[in-house]
Amino acid sequence: FTPQANAPAIDSPMAVDTSLLDVYWSELDGQPLPATLQEVRDYADRLEERYGVTILLSSQAKEACESVWDAVITTTDEAGLSDEPHAIARMLEALDRTLALYPEDFFRQMRNSMGEGGVRIMPVGHIDNDVNAIGLTSESYEWQNIFIDVNIDAFEGTICHEIWHATEGVILTRNWDSFDQEEWDRCNPDGFFYNEDAGAPASDPERWTFFYEFHPQDIYFVDAYARTNAKEDRARIMEYMMASEDVAGALMQSPAIVQKLEIMCRAIRDNFDTSGWSDLRWERLLPSA
């Protein structure tokens, strides 16, 4: 063919749209950080390598924070912290301890079939939403984004709570029917319906909860927040199974909590390669363990 010098430019039909790829790599790499954060960035890099997660610090998390539609999340560089490096370091130290509770390849298995995405964790300065959350998980492209407020006193339970949300997100992506709602509802009191609105609790929010009832057979939920919806119910159970040894043992005296945990454990085993796993922390107190 003969090119025409003055012809209008037309995109080739063979051209590849790289916009999504550009977004992926931009979110993966983050932005350069100031020298004052280099030490915590180096620590985060080591955790990424050890556990198979991605960690974004300070301004690196800005784009991910802005992608959340139901909360306003402030990055640590914009939160007016008196010592940003120290605040981030505290959270990373707790994150290190918490991630070590999970099987070696657990988080790598949460990536897609191409090895992309997975769990991305971000220490943030503040989360503003209807329930004043101290942790939040959202999905974006192939990522399960976990945001943790650096100002809280104890991180481990919150991190485990949000890791369950990320785990459930991956499970449902692989098999939407992994949790049979009718089976789950049979683990709840007769006639019970989740409130579905944490900002407007039920008239008797403590009923049937571990911190209110005296008899194990009357306990169906960890606390009032667990009565919000099935996902928060499951996340509360896993939070205490993973991060609170004393409460976990007491919770397992409840037949309903045992049944719920068994359903959760089955969903994990059905959607992860567990052949190399042993002594799973979340299964250690099950009657069959």
Regions found by a protein language model. Name each.
Residues 3-90, 200-215, 231, 264, ...:
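Non-catalytic architectural context of zinc metalloproteases
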Residues 114-289:
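Active-site-flanking segments in enzyme catalytic domains
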